[in-house]
Structure formats: C-alpha cells, structure tokens
Amino acid sequence: MEMKKWSYANLITLALLFLFFIILLLAFQGGSRDDDHQHVHVAIRTKDISMGRKLKSLKPINPTKKNGFEYPDQGSHDVQEREVYVELRDYGQRKYKPPVHN
C-alpha cells in the first residue's frame, strides 16, 4: 500500500509540473519583437456599435520608420501600443426588431 500512495503523489506532482510548464509556454509564445506583423488594437465603444457605426479605416499617426511606427516625442525604443486615427462611418440608427416568440 505504501508504494501506491507514493506513486499517486508522484503522478500528481508530475501533472502539476506539466501544467505549470504549459502555462509558461503559453505566456511567452508571443513571438519575436522584430517580426513584420503590425498588430493594432482599436477600442470601439458599445454605443458606437449600437448606433450603427462601422469601422471605416485605420491610419497610423506619423509613421516615420520603415519597419514600424515612431513618433517625434518618443525615442527609438520599441513601440508596443500604436495610436491610430479611427474613422467611423455612421449608418444611422439601427432599427429595433422585436424578439420572435415561437
């Protein structure tokens, strides 16, 4: 019986270590910083969506670097968050559709 208790504890410990390493791998799998992918996150408010506005275009503000964005008030360090002009096209009020009851 003593052997089974030790093996169950060992198995649980190994499973927890495995989960820990998977979490670490997922946390740091963002890729290299020098890749050419430009990810821009834009926050569009819920009110804009409910008013029927749609995202029309994104334009970077003052792109001065060939491989990225650099602004006059910043040094040459890597810019993580990039500002963009967001142009919303207004399609008018959304029409209210009453729920369909079966």
From Swiss-Prot:
A GO cellular component entry from the record: extracellular space
Proregion positions: 28-89
Tissue expression from the record: Expressed in roots and sepals.
Modified residues (Hydroxyproline): P99
Signal peptide range: 1-27
One BP annotation, GO: regulation of root morphogenesis
Keyword Acetylation: no
Secreted is among the record's keywords: yes
Keyword terms, alphabetized: Differentiation, Growth factor, Hydroxylation, Secreted, Signal, Sulfation
Gene inactivation effect: Shorter root hairs.
Any one GO molecular function term: growth factor activity
Region (Disordered): 56-78
Sulfotyrosine modifications at: Y91
Note: 'Golven' means irregular waves in Dutch.
Family: Belongs to the RGF family.
Name of this protein: Protein GOLVEN 4
Taxonomic source organism: Arabidopsis thaliana
Lineage: Eukaryota, Viridiplantae, Streptophyta, Embryophyta, Tracheophyta
